[in-house]
């Protein structure tokens, strides 16, 4: 007679056997699911900075208006500007979700007073387009920080990890492309284990879920 443990292990083995080929096939088609281009987002960010200088509100408005006017992205952009706190990896800041789907997210993240933390090790490439202020990053073995001023891009490659810091006020257009759902665990961990700020967690869940489901209904994975 089989034990509960052996039965569970068989279930896991069958599940992996079924899911692994599906994940592999989806991975091969990943590029076809994207509607945003990281190079275009960088160009758009630098244009907004050139026009609006240190006026972060105007920079963000410029970027969102341009994305709403672009035929390729207009229907995938959130309808309203909703800000929530985000605690992840020990860092804290404000977050405005412009787009969220299974394979991409585009947000404004930042703070007016500075923050520092762990980037997380993610299942997506993450592009931080710095809009105002600076972002610093550090990897073990180096003796100098990586410094990313306004107008630059900090590319955190999929599966890599760094310490990062926004030493003072800093805001970034953050674009992730890859598998987004596994990243949500990192986004919720601090709230569930440290801050216990359940109203913020609920608001984040509502906005993220609404955007992801809405885009799925449009056929956007």
Curated annotation (Swiss-Prot):
Q: Where are the transmembrane segments?
A: 5-25
EC no. given is 5.-.-.-
Q: How does it sit in the membrane?
A: Single-pass membrane protein
Q: Name one GO molecular function term.
A: isomerase activity
Query: Is the Ribosomal protein keyword given for this protein?
Result: no
Q: Name one GO biological process term.
A: ergosterol biosynthetic process
Cystine bridges: none
What is the enzyme's main class?
Answer: isomerase
Pfam families on file: ERG2_Sigma1R
Gene Ontology, cellular component aspect:
endoplasmic reticulum membrane
User: What InterPro entries does the record point to?
Assistant: ERG2_sigma1_rcpt-like (IPR006716)
Entry keywords, A to Z: Endoplasmic reticulum, Isomerase, Lipid biosynthesis, Lipid metabolism, Membrane, Steroid biosynthesis, Steroid metabolism, Sterol biosynthesis, Sterol metabolism, Transmembrane, Transmembrane helix
Please report which protein family the annotation says this sequence is part of.
Belongs to the ERG2 family.
What name does the UniProt record give this protein? C-8 sterol isomerase
């Amino acid at each position: 007679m089989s034990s509960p443990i052996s039965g569970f292990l068989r279930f896991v083995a069958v599940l992996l056997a079924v899911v692994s080929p599906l994940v592999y096939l989806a991975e091969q088609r990943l590029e076809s699911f994207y509607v945003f281009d990281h190079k275009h987002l960088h160009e758009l960010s630098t244009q907004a900075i050139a026009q609006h200088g240190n006026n972060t509100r105007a920079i963000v408005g410029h970027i969102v208006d341009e994305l709403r006017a672009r035929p390729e992205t207009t229907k995938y952009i959130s309808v309203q500007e909703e800000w929530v706190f985000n605690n992840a990896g020990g860092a804290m800041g404000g977050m405005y979700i412009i787009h969220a789907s299974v394979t991409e997210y585009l947000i404004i993240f930042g703070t007016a007073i500075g923050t520092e933390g762990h980037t997380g090790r993610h299942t997506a490439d993450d592009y931080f387009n710095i809009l105002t202020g600076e972002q610093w990053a550090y990897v073990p073995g180096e003796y100098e920080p990586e410094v990313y001023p306004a107008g630059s891009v900090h590319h955190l490659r999929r599966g890599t990890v760094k310490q990062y810091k926004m030493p003072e006020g800093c805001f970034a257009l953050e674009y992730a492309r890859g598998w987004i759902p596994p990243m949500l665990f990192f986004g919720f961990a601090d709230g569930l284990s440290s801050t216990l700020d359940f109203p913020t967690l609920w608001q984040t869940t509502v906005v993220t879920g609404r955007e992801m489901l809405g885009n799925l209904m449009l056929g956007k994975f």
